[in-house]
Structures are given as structure tokens and as C-alpha cells.
Amino acid sequence: LTYQKSLYKEPAEWSENPDVAPVDRMFRTPDLYGYFTMQYTPTKKFSMSLTGTYSGPMLVQHMESSVTPVDIAVETPSFFDANFKIAKDFSIFPMVNLQLNGGVMNLFNSFQKDFDTGADRDSGYIYGPMMPRSIYFGVKLSL
């Protein structure tokens, strides 16, 4: 877990609109963020893992679009993105191993709730986890 503060020495202009106030915080840099990884291997051929990423609130630019009439600096919500994987190994020949695995990415389905829409949307107004909750299965063959 990391706590840091990214500030400009002097408030910075970020919009071409002179009515938009400058900001002293750097955009897209949360003050608090971190990750964790846990792995459990009860037997040599079976494993489970749990990973996660936390991103605290941050300031992002939301430029003039179909949703907002002027450029604004938006404070995002925090996000927690967790992933789970389970794997089982099988020896199919003396030097060949087959692994079957599966899991869930973005376990809690964390995502941005306020996307812009329409032809005049701000395509740069994207933050938070990129993938929705996803279930996957895999096969790995190793020598």
C-alpha cells in the first residue's frame, strides 16, 4: 500500500477555457494505491491464487462534451479490483505436464459508472478497471 501526494509547485492551467480554474493536484495520480498477491498450494499439483489492486480517488479531466458543458476536474471514486485463479496439474508423460486452470477476473465487477456517450463524448474520460467481470478457463502444456 502506498500513500503519496503529487502536487504542482504552482496551480497549473489545464483547460483552454479561461473560466476553468487551475489545479494544484496532478491528474490521474491517486494519493493511495496498492496491490496484494496471495497463493495457496496445498499439494504439488494444485494451487489457488488471489490478487487485488486498490486505486484511491484521483482527479481526472472531463473535457467539454455532450455530458458536460465546460471542462471540469472530477474526483473519481476509489476502485478495488480482485482476481481469483485455481489450477490443477496432471503428468501425462514423464517429462510433459498438462495444467487445467480457471478463474474470475474483476471479481466484484468494479468499473466506471459515468461514461460519456454520443457523438460529442470525451473519449479521454476513462478511468478505473478496464475489464468487466470475466470468467476464463485455460489449458497449459509444458515440457
Predicted regions and their residues:
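Gram-negative outer-membrane beta-barrel transporters
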Residues: L1-M63
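Extracellular loop and loop/strand-boundary signature of outer-membrane beta-barrel proteins
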Residues: S15-R25, T68-V74, D122-Y127
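Flexible, active-site-adjacent loop/turn segments at secondary-structure boundaries
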Residues: D24-F27, P77, M105-N106
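Surface-exposed coil/turn segments at beta-strand junctions on protein surfaces, enriched
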Residues: T29, T41-T43, E75-P77, S91-F93, ...
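Residues that define the transmembrane beta-barrel architecture of outer-membrane proteins
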Residues: P30-G34, S78-A82, V96, M131-I135
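Transmembrane beta-strands of outer-membrane beta-barrel proteins
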Residues: G34-F36, M48-L50, F84, L98-G102, ...
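C-terminal beta-signal and adjacent terminal beta-strands/loops
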Residues: Y54-M63, K88-L143
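Short, local alpha-helical segments
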Residues: S65-D71, F80-D89
